[in-house]
Amino acid sequence: MQVTSVGHAGFLIESRAGSILCDPWVNPAYFASWFPFPDNSQLDWDALGDVDYLYVSHLHKDHFDPEHLRRYVNKDAVVLLPDYPVPDLRRELEKLGFHNFFETTDSVKHTVSGPKGDLDVMIIALRAPADGPIGDSGLVVSDRVTTVFNMNDARPVDLDVLHTDFGQIDVHMLQYSGAIWYPMVYDMPARAKEAFGIQKRQRQMDRCRQYIAQVGATWVVPSAGPPCFLDPELRDLNDDHGDPANIFPDQMVFLEQLRIHGHDGGLLMIPGSTADFTGSTLNSLTHPVDDPESIFTTGKAAYIEDYAQRMAPVLAAEKARWAPSAGEPMLEALRALFEPIMTQTDQICDGIGYPVELRLTGRDHNETVVLDFPKRVVREPIPDEKFRYGFEIPAALVRTVLRDEEPDWVNTIFLSTRFRAWRVGGYNEYLYTFFKCLTDERIAYADGWFAEAHDDSSSITLDGFQIQRRCPHLKADLSKFGVVEGNTLTCNLHGWQWNLENGRCLTTKGHELRCQKL
């Protein structure tokens, strides 16, 4: 089996039984904030797109690139479709002309048969509101000699099914770097922001190592990030200037962490790198350049500068597509968008629990709108009103998502990092869930998900405490992801924390943990 990196989370998996193209992403994403790193635009995409199977893990724009899929990928390819409760992914692929779908069942091993032979596949589908745009997934592929697990940026809760159905995993591709706007966009003291950044940088790599230990693959390929920020307004987000609080470490940083912790099976792959495997044996690893490591080390800043110069026309063209900042007040348009969604979800509106301020700003427009979740209305602010949570977003971006009828502001505005935020207290998961569920179908699913009781009947003992086995957040197994420091429990799946003296969640309201000291 051959595995070729096509950039970011993208891979071409080739075997005698067929070829699978996974998550090809080339065009800038999230209001042109994110570019693939290293540059993959010069690959032979006509050849790469001539495949038997296509796998798109989820709808985040650094995985689902509609323009690229429309232009380059064989429309007769069989799409390996994750088992999602809301069929948005299938609908979007159908719009692009794909018509052959193999609908998988979550975490069930399937055999796909084509003219070249049989492949065993499994797609682990994650369905919580926090997982992607209502869905994220990982793909297992076996040609019955070699088995690869392309986890990309999914965060599976239970991986025992891998070994039950496939035995030894030979190659494991997964995310290790940042893919979020925290803490950079938040108004907070510089020392606090630095401390949170240092903590997040390490935690996300620790989580990745925990997954690697659970899967136990012979070879590990760090993937699915980091992105590259080429807009001069965002260039400081690149990890090329020795900032220990930067949340976007690159492959070389993580491979060194693996070595420090005794794992020598890490592989550096850049766009165009090809690894050939027979079972757990690595037969060869070839790269498109003589010294790929220099892209991430001595030559990184120069590489990014050259990349930015090449992509300046692309960036300018993307910005030209944005709606103008100036225009009519947006209160009525936002009311028409948000209020019908608010009225459909007591779970999420009550979970948010307070009004949220939206400042819409630009050279030609300044407006403040209040999302009053307790009252389920969108209104103007009351004089001298104070807010626990607020955002300042360029008016041009809000006009653009309104014009384009975007169903998900996380997948457009928030991942762009082109905004500011402030809050009193902890992270509010319900708020960001609301912003990613701006359709009747999505909000109905998310409301129902939160309404379901979480199973906390099983218990474990961890460092002198008896606690419920499943994390109150997304049901991760705390015997694998839980870490106790003093009287604080951290679930390393998403970094949420609890006070073990009283079970109170320290990250957000609700989500209490059943626990007692032994």
From Swiss-Prot:
Pfam family, one: Rieske
Domain Rieske, first and last residues per copy: 431-518
SUPFAM superfamilies reported in the protein's UniProt record: ISP domain, Metallo-hydrolase/oxidoreductase
Ligand binding ([2Fe-2S] cluster): C471, H473, C491, H494
GO molecular function: 2 iron, 2 sulfur cluster binding; metal ion binding; monooxygenase activity; oxidoreductase activity, acting on paired donors, with incorporation or reduction of molecular oxygen
Cofactor comment: Binds 1 [2Fe-2S] cluster per subunit.
Cofactor(s) the record lists: [2Fe-2S] cluster
GO cellular component terms, semicolon-separated: cytoplasm
EC annotation from Swiss-Prot or TrEMBL: 1.-.-.-
Chain positions of cross-link Isoglutamyl lysine isopeptide (Lys-Gln) (interchain with Q-Cter in protein Pup): K375
Keyword list, A-Z: 2Fe-2S, Iron, Iron-sulfur, Isopeptide bond, Metal-binding, Oxidoreductase, Ubl conjugation
PANTHER family, per database record: N-ACYL-PHOSPHATIDYLETHANOLAMINE-HYDROLYZING PHOSPHOLIPASE D (PTHR15032:SF4)
Name of the protein described by the UniProt record: Putative Rieske 2Fe-2S iron-sulfur protein MSMEG_6410/MSMEI_6242
Organism: Mycolicibacterium smegmatis (strain ATCC 700084 / mc(2)155) (Mycobacterium smegmatis)
Lineage, broadest ranks: Bacteria, Bacillati, Actinomycetota, Actinomycetes, Mycobacteriales
